[in-house]
């Protein structure tokens, strides 16, 4: 930091914001702030925030010399921005023959203001949430119900929340795909078969700001089912209960994915193992198939970490977890076999960094029900 300029070296996903906020803090023009972007490491949306940049700028200004600011893991766990907690409420109506004909999905939680959205102008528009399609996973519900409605109720959180890998999709897709399974059970229909029926006639759903190609979702569902061996029974043994679950989603209009999870649960419900996750993918023209496989594997590890142990506890307004010793993430000895199958499309290539995250939790939860008859309606998964 100099009298009339500033140079920053930083791993950031938002260099423009870093430049503008540093300039505002120092009272100098934005063009007098040079931001050099280093290798990012794991960003996952956290580095869209620039709080750590401003900390370095303030210290550098006070010190009057170049400084390097490093956060410990403890700092990172306690002073980061957390994935927003949400509540999802769903209802469905069946006709006399057991066919689903009505759907209601209400979602409640912090909105995208964590990204600087919506703008002040958008906030004055009473139709903003429907017109701009928030939250994801609710407004772009692919299933074909004769009558359906969705609503999003934004609330302020006392906890600082921020972007998370797949942003708003995970909670809404977990609720939606779990509830479709509940409808299947109530209708005495195979969960995969019900999804295929609800996606007929395989048309394109035009939502004005996005389009959902149901035929592409049908294709990945059928591929995932075929590669996983659905609906053949899994092996059973004396001490464990085995089950298989399915979930699917469209990510940001241009990526279609279906997953089948295979799990086993000890009969005393104290030990859950995820043995295999099969993914079928259509993200248009796949320019880097190996990259898609790698992103699928990392997304599954991310989704499993969140589904099985991703929890922050607060006491006196302070996060209690301080390291990976008490914040549990997936370990290698618990990692499942991952299989990724690609449908090579001709559409424009779609981004795939987050696509495989939202379906992991519902696929596992639905597999748990298949094995034990117990529904999972809360994350992280717990039998207590």
What are these model-predicted stretches?
Residues 1-384:
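Cofactor-binding beta-sheet edge motifs in enzyme active sites
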